[in-house]
């Protein structure tokens, strides 16, 4: 196969010229005739049985060329781009330059390819200093969260409701004496001070006891989501059925055992909480260092203009992953759009706004892979398969079938590039001051 690649000097695209040999062409013509023969009728012959010579006399072999080209072009194009060593990022625009009988066919394809990257410094990036220390106050705060989670609601028999208490109420609202949709409920549990209701509602229940009827006068905010109620005064008739207060458990060994069956004392729980917080801070610090170092490396690099096809592919991929994630969590995307008053196009635009940054980042990481000669070994691939199988609850054979080796190697090499950039980064207070 004769292949010639001429890259444009001012954009990530070029012209690929390639030939299709006569043997391949003849096979394509033969297949085209077989398909055509089945659907044509010629006087004197049964449908589907016209001889090749008669067909050629009546229609000419050239009538099969376009069908034959459609048959052989995909494989010929794939072979040509492989020989040229290019990575197309969009469907090519193919033109036939010559299609003569008995001669190789010559074609040209206008091909958009990955932009070239000129790397700057990517090792030793200055990143904000990360604080991974865990204080006693951090531990105390986490223990207090656990106390809140273990709290019980206890009835206040003859005591007034206070901020933080839970009241069980019936309420019915009206504006100018008229009831409105969503303005009433029975046996509703409301935490006073939570800000769940419109401003002023919860405050007016503080100081009242179970069994009391309370008139609550409020004004809907000007920016209230129901436009017909925005800015209007409303009266709510409220009946208080119960008042409950939160009782927190004592911070002692019994509490520790209730919270975590693997510990026996409060001291052990504190140590375990401190270790968990330490792990969380170190993981967050690692992620922050990676993000900052990669961002700096990307800023130091230069790329050609990114083809629109790459931006569109990235946007579509992000959108589909997001929608798939919704469905995995049991969320109906159409219901989500209805509730949030958005559309799929709104979501697509959000992803499109950051597509250039994501694509450039990936291009730079791929360039680092080449520059640093980072390769995925057989052991790397096997470990990646094992990790993915564990992560998704699949067997390793299923993972191997779902992902090609090229995909696995690419992901591994990108991770190695990320590690190389992040591990060589320098944490400095100066970088933190810049932020």
From Swiss-Prot:
<dbReference type="GO" id="GO:0051083">
    <property type="term" value="P:'de novo' cotranslational protein folding"/>
</dbReference>
<dbReference type="InterPro" id="IPR001179">
    <property type="entry name" value="PPIase_FKBP_dom"/>
</dbReference>
<keyword id="KW-0697">Rotamase</keyword>
<keyword id="KW-0131">Cell cycle</keyword>
<dbReference type="InterPro" id="IPR027304">
    <property type="entry name" value="Trigger_fact/SurA_dom_sf"/>
</dbReference>
<keyword id="KW-0132">Cell division</keyword>
<feature type="domain" description="PPIase FKBP-type">
    <location>
        <begin position="164"/>
        <end position="249"/>
    </location>
</feature>
<dbReference type="GO" id="GO:0044183">
    <property type="term" value="F:protein folding chaperone"/>
</dbReference>
<dbReference type="GO" id="GO:0043022">
    <property type="term" value="F:ribosome binding"/>
</dbReference>
<dbReference type="InterPro" id="IPR008881">
    <property type="entry name" value="Trigger_fac_ribosome-bd_bac"/>
</dbReference>
<comment type="function">
    <text>Involved in protein export. Acts as a chaperone by maintaining the newly synthesized protein in an open conformation. Functions as a peptidyl-prolyl cis-trans isomerase.</text>
</comment>
<dbReference type="InterPro" id="IPR037041">
    <property type="entry name" value="Trigger_fac_C_sf"/>
</dbReference>
<feature type="region of interest" description="Disordered">
    <location>
        <begin position="125"/>
        <end position="147"/>
    </location>
</feature>
<dbReference type="Pfam" id="PF05698">
    <property type="entry name" value="Trigger_C"/>
</dbReference>
<comment type="similarity">
    <text>Belongs to the FKBP-type PPIase family. Tig subfamily.</text>
</comment>
<keyword id="KW-0963">Cytoplasm</keyword>
<dbReference type="Pfam" id="PF00254">
    <property type="entry name" value="FKBP_C"/>
</dbReference>
<keyword id="KW-0143">Chaperone</keyword>
<dbReference type="GO" id="GO:0061077">
    <property type="term" value="P:chaperone-mediated protein folding"/>
</dbReference>
<dbReference type="InterPro" id="IPR046357">
    <property type="entry name" value="PPIase_dom_sf"/>
</dbReference>
<dbReference type="GO" id="GO:0003755">
    <property type="term" value="F:peptidyl-prolyl cis-trans isomerase activity"/>
</dbReference>
<dbReference type="GO" id="GO:0051301">
    <property type="term" value="P:cell division"/>
</dbReference>
<protein>
    <recommendedName>
        <fullName>Trigger factor</fullName>
        <ecNumber>5.2.1.8</ecNumber>
    </recommendedName>
</protein>
<dbReference type="InterPro" id="IPR005215">
    <property type="entry name" value="Trig_fac"/>
</dbReference>
<keyword id="KW-0413">Isomerase</keyword>
<dbReference type="GO" id="GO:0005737">
    <property type="term" value="C:cytoplasm"/>
</dbReference>
<dbReference type="Pfam" id="PF05697">
    <property type="entry name" value="Trigger_N"/>
</dbReference>
<dbReference type="GO" id="GO:0015031">
    <property type="term" value="P:protein transport"/>
</dbReference>
<dbReference type="GO" id="GO:0043335">
    <property type="term" value="P:protein unfolding"/>
</dbReference>
<dbReference type="InterPro" id="IPR008880">
    <property type="entry name" value="Trigger_fac_C"/>
</dbReference>
<dbReference type="InterPro" id="IPR036611">
    <property type="entry name" value="Trigger_fac_ribosome-bd_sf"/>
</dbReference>
